[in-house]
Amino acid sequence: METRPSSSLSSPEESCEAFPQGLLVFTGSSDRDANLAKQFWIGASMYPHNESQLVLSRGSSQRLPVARPSRSSAPEKTYFQPFFLEESKSRDVTAETLKIQESEEKKKYLQKAKKRDEIIQLLRKQREERILKELISLPHKPKGKVHKAKKVISESDKEDQEEVKALD
């Protein structure tokens, strides 16, 4: 069984760092299935390709300059306090609007349910009335003639019947 991952990692040391051997254990599986599973999990780790990693030269700096702390700490407190108050107020407002929207939706669905029940009751009433009318008019309806379909017997069936009669 091969313990080295796919060629996306450049060296065996990197594969050991990415997945120590104790973590990838597939007991009860065939070697082929274990290898495929290991390749999948190593490929799914989403490490960047070596070509896409940033390389810093000695003269380049890719970091932004660090902000220096301000000398007075009192303005910071007044700056941050309104932010927290506004945030809590906005949370309250959003919570209230959510409650209002939920109550409106609930009212809307209750109205729909009430209308649905009314429609179902109306349909039941109409059905009962229709059944009563049919029962009242049933004795007065003319009785239809029962048409007996003529049996069409094919020649092969006739021959079969004649053969059966001949056997008796």
From Swiss-Prot:
Major localization listed first in the record, in broad terms: cytoplasm
Ranges annotated as biased composition (Basic residues): 142-151
Keywords, ordered alphabetically: Cell projection, Cytoplasm
Renumbered residue ranges of the record's region Disordered: 142-168
Transmembrane segment boundaries: none
Subcellular location: Cytoplasm; Cell projection, Cilium
Top-level taxon in the UniProt lineage: Eukaryota
UniProt cross-references to InterPro entries, sorted A to Z: HOATZ-like
GO cellular component labels: cilium; cytoplasm
Example of a GO biological process term: spermatogenesis
Function: Required for motile ciliogenesis and flagellar genesis by mediating the maturation of the glycolytic enzyme ENO4.
Family: Belongs to the HOATZ family.
Protein's name according to its UniProt entry: Cilia- and flagella-associated protein HOATZ
Organism of provenance: Bos taurus (Bovine)
Lineage: Eukaryota, Metazoa, Chordata, Craniata, Vertebrata
